[in-house]
Regions:
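Sec-dependent signal peptide recognition
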Residues: 3-10
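Short beta-alpha junctions and helix-cap segments that line functional grooves
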Residues: 146-149
Length: 168
């Protein structure tokens, strides 16, 4: 019985000592994950590539608190996107609507939908076929900044245009 108890004690120590070590793998952020997609996005110097779109045209529009109306800067960014889409007719976009962490999940999903639809309606009114644009709302579920101050909140209040060559 004593040998069984010693054996159990030794195994317990090994298990516990393995749990007390710090993880050596750092936390991976979305930007790190997204950088792996650069291979598929093409060359940033190719004006017909998704990488060019993201870097030079701009893929996001920011919004004021509790607003879904586009300001002039947002309209200008969307006009640049529309020009790129007119030159690259094989691509479609999915506009993701996002919100900051304040408010309920339901409210922020609805606000994200209004933001995505605002960008979509602007794009369609300027000549992009509605069949080339889909919208989705993530509300506050996918923040790009994780802190509780206005700088972070403002980056999370956005509509992001994700370019795709897949059929809807």
């Amino acid at each position: 019985m004593k040998s069984l108890l010693k054996y159990f004690f030794a195994i317990s120590l090994l298990v516990l000592s393995g749990c007390s070590q710090n993880a050596s793998t750092p936390f991976t952020t979305n930007s790190t994950l997204n950088s792996s997609n650069a291979i598929f996005d093409g060359d940033v110097n190719d004006p017909n590539s998704i990488a060019f779109f993201k870097k030079n045209v701009g893929d996001r529009v920011l919004f004021a608190v509790d607003q879904s109306d586009l300001d002039q800067l947002g309209k200008n960014i969307l006009l640049g996107q529309l020009e790129w889409l007119q030159a690259n007719k094989d691509y479609k976009i999915i506009i993701e609507g996002h919100a900051d962490e304040r408010g309920t999940r339901e409210y922020n999903l609805a606000l994200g939908a209004r933001r995505a639809n605002s960008a979509r309606e602007f794009s369609v009114s300027r000549g992009i076929k509605s069949s080339r644009i889909q919208t989705v709302s993530f509300g506050k579920e996918r923040p790009v900044e994780l802190c509780s101050n206005e700088n972070c909140y403002s980056e999370n209040r956005r509509a992001v245009s994700v370019v795709s060559n897949l059929k809807f």
